[in-house]
Swiss-Prot record:
PROSITE patterns: STEROL_REDUCT_1, STEROL_REDUCT_2. GO terms for molecular function: Delta14-sterol reductase activity. This is Delta(14)-sterol reductase erg24B. Coiled coil: none annotated. It comes from the Eukaryota. In Aspergillus, the biosynthesis pathway of the sterol precursors leading to the prevalent sterol ergosterol differs from yeast. The ring system of lanosterol in S.cerevisiae is firstly demethylised in three enzymatic steps leading to the intermediate zymosterol and secondly a methyl group is added to zymosterol by the sterol 24-C-methyltransferase to form fecosterol. In Aspergillus, lanosterol is firstly transmethylated by the sterol 24-C-methyltransferase leading to the intermediate eburicol and secondly demethylated in three steps to form fecosterol. Belongs to the ERG4/ERG24 family. NADP(+) binds at residues 382, 386, 409, 414, 421-422, 490, 494-498, 505. Pathway: Steroid metabolism; ergosterol biosynthesis. One of its GO terms (biological process) is ergosterol biosynthetic process.
């Protein structure tokens, strides 16, 4: 595999092959940019169909997940298991569809609170101390400057959540607000991400043409200015859209917001963990206890997010920042898809509390550890060899030299498969889903013998058992497909770059991701 700097945990972007692994990348040569743009669109034959399908289809899918796996009738809603007798009226009743219809999915007050969260994150970016870093060299010449303090911002916000929970318990206003207005919070984020995507699309037409004065180092993204309006809006025309806030008494770097980097590392990632915590609070409010499964899942996800935030500067060497424009794809993915799809396992467990027990915990930990050993071992091995090939830990590794001067490892982890780190990354993703077990439940109403009041309880029935896995294991399947797509794109890029050397390399390292299988 090509030697790249992939020292941190992978950050997974929702749709494209983004956030899958950290990699250093040479600045794009103009000839390569022209070749890349004319070579193909990312969705090839399905430009408008693919873009339209994602822009309108994925938000609908997210709403469907939220309604079809619920705390009113079950997960999935019982009528979905009997399609021959399915009726819209019955389904609306089972999923809790609001009486006011689709307009009830939006609430102005909720949207204002969500905007307040975005504003808080923005102000923390500006005023909190942080590390200033230069990005990679741009094709238009020069390097952009970035200020990073996402980890500090997250620590302060989570500390505030901890104080609120200490004072008010699980009735802390933030926890009840997020659960009671969950659908409206989704809508608010969807509106915000769409508005940002429209803004950066329209603003991209003011990017200076080659040869014109360009003091802000603005440039269009390769493949993002095809002339197809819908596709360009979706994929992103401008590479690094930025705004300068009119805030006095702070440095220019501090008040300059790189919209793409800010969206990728701030509101959505931290929002994901905040939603997990609100789900834990809901479980305690409902049942009076917290299960090991929801704690374990939240711990895995929190570690993943905090690791990404702590290593925030590593984002500058990813394909996202170097090559991909910022459009609806990343805007929606970062601010809607990631937090509201990725918290689904803990949301499920908050309604159907499942105890893993010691043996279950050990199994999940063992699977996660196996994935981590593969992922971290492969990346560390590559980084050490790239930094110092004479390091005693890697000097025994075999490699081939290419005409470009790069060295491709053919032994050790990278002799097992050309993208062995993807296998470890995918196995680690299982840890989010396995704690939900064989998912599925129905909401059963019964009389509380002590109080005489009607109560609802989530019970796993033979009919519902297993069907909930469509929702709780969707992430694992989706991420696997994402990695396969990324692997194919990597293979094409490496074949173009290395030519005959890549053919020689693949003849020596035959497996792509899973040794001996694929």
């Amino acid at each position: 595999m090509k030697l790249r700097n992939t020292g941190q945990m992978a950050f997974r972007s929702p749709f494209s092959n983004l956030h899958v692994r950290r990699s250093s990348h040479k600045p794009s040569h103009p000839a390569f940019v022209r070749q890349n743009r004319s070579m193909h669109y990312y969705f090839r034959d399905a430009l408008n169909i693919g873009a339209f399908g994602i822009i309108f289809g994925l938000p609908c899918l997210l709403y469907a997940f939220t309604f079809f796996c619920n705390d009113i009738s079950g997960c999935p809603a019982p009528s979905l298991l009997h399609p021959s007798t399915l009726s819209i009226d019955k389904l609306e009743q089972e999923v809790g569809w609001p009486e006011d219809g689709i307009k009830a999915l939006y609430d102005t007050q909720v949207t204002m609170w969500v905007l307040s969260y975005y504003l808080l994150s923005l102000l923390m970016q500006v005023f909190l101390p942080g590390t200033e870093v230069e990005g990679t060299e741009l094709a238009c010449g020069g390097r952009l400057k970035y200020k990073f303090n996402a980890f500090l911002s997250a620590v302060l916000i989570l500390s505030g959540c901890a104080v609120g929970t200490y004072l008010y318990g699980t009735e802390f206003a933030l926890w009840t607000f997020l659960w009671d207005n969950y659908v409206q919070v989704i809508t608010a984020n969807l509106i915000i991400c769409t508005a940002i995507a429209i803004f950066v699309y329209l603003r991209s037409f003011s990017v200076p043409a080659p040869g014109q004065l360009n003091p802000e180092l603005r440039q269009l993204a390769p493949g993002g200015h095809t002339g197809n309006v819908l596709y360009d809006f979706f994929i992103g025309r401008e590479l690094n859209p930025r705004i300068k806030l009119p805030i006095p008494f702070v440095g220019e770097t501090a008040r300059t917001i790189d919209i793409k980097v800010w969206c990728e590392m701030r509101p959505g990632l931290l929002g994901w963990i905040i939603l997990d915590l609100s789900n834990i609070a809901h479980q305690y409010r409902t049942y009076g206890y917290i299960t090991d499964s929801i704690v374990l899942t939240t711990a895995f996800q929190a570690f993943y997010v905090l690791d990404a935030l702590y290593m925030e500067p590593a984002l500058l060497t990813t394909m996202d920042v170097i090559m991909d424009g910022f459009g609806f794809m990343l805007s929606f993915g970062d601010m809607v898809w990631v937090p509201f799809l990725y918290n689904f396992q803990t949301r499920y467990l908050s309604v159907y509390p499942s105890e893993l027990g010691l043996s279950g915990i050990l199994i999940v930990l063992a699977v996660t550890a196996a994935g981590y050993v593969i992922f971290r071992g492969a990346n560390n091995q590559k980084n050490r060899f790239r930094t110092d090939p004479n390091d005693p830990r890697v000097k025994h590794l075999k490699y081939i030299e290419t005409k470009t001067g790069s060295k491709l490892l053919i032994s050790g982890w990278w002799g097992c498969a050309r993208h062995i780190n993807y296998l470890g990354d995918w196995i680690m993703s299982w840890s989010y889903c396995l704690p939900t077990g064989v998912a599925g439940y129905a909401i059963i109403e019964s009389i509380n013998p002590a109080s005489g009041e009607m109560q609802k309880q989530a019970v796993q029935t033979p009919e519902s058992r297993g069907w909930g896995m469509i929702f709780t294991y969707f992430y694992m399947i989706y991420f696997g497909v994402l990695l396969l797509h990324r692997e194919r794109r990597d293979e094409e890029k490496c074949k173009r770059k290395y030519g005959a050397d890549w053919n020689r390399y693949t003849s020596l390292v035959r497996s792509r991701i899973i040794p001996g299988i694929y």
